[in-house]
Curated annotation (Swiss-Prot):
GO molecular function: proton-transporting ATP synthase activity, rotational mechanism
Function: F(1)F(0) ATP synthase produces ATP from ADP in the presence of a proton or sodium gradient. F-type ATPases consist of two structural domains, F(1) containing the extramembraneous catalytic core and F(0) containing the membrane proton channel, linked together by a central stalk and a peripheral stalk. During catalysis, ATP synthesis in the catalytic domain of F(1) is coupled via a rotary mechanism of the central stalk subunits to proton translocation.
Name assigned to this protein: ATP synthase subunit delta
Compartment(s) of residence: Cell inner membrane
Membrane topology according to the record: Peripheral membrane protein
Amino acid sequence: MAETATIARPYAEALFRVASEAGNLGAWSELVSEMGQIAANPDIKALADDPNVPGDKLGDLFLSVVKSPVNDEARRFVKLLVENNRLTVMPEVAEQFHALKNAREGSSDVEITSAFPLDGQPLNDLVAALERKFGRKLYAKVAVDPSLIGGVSVKVGDEVLDTSVRARLAAMQTALTAV
């Protein structure tokens, strides 16, 4: 949703500046990701949208669920989100924060979808090959989709490499019906 992204951008940029100045992007990245996951929870969303829940209680409740250590800057950030009725955009803030971190580090996220579970050495080999192809460090998120039949589908940014059997069958069908 473009509107959510637009609303979240200044929050993500401000939080990224604070994390950069503190010099611990790794710890901040973990904290922001966790806060994004918590804010995406339907129960938290319902509380955030409930006008009968006081803001200070909502902020305290939200922070009590966070397992990572929460510093004063993060507490103030959550308070700011709650005061501006923006806690529900935290998942998008986390996504944009992560994108800013990746841009700074010259890395990217890669979404790998496989027909079968992929882990261990085969996953490491695939990620290494993809890092050579894209020329940057990649952080893999792996999903399983049996409908691929075989092979993998890889998404890095807006680039997609689909070597799945399903994609090959679709290409054959297109070629055969075009005649």
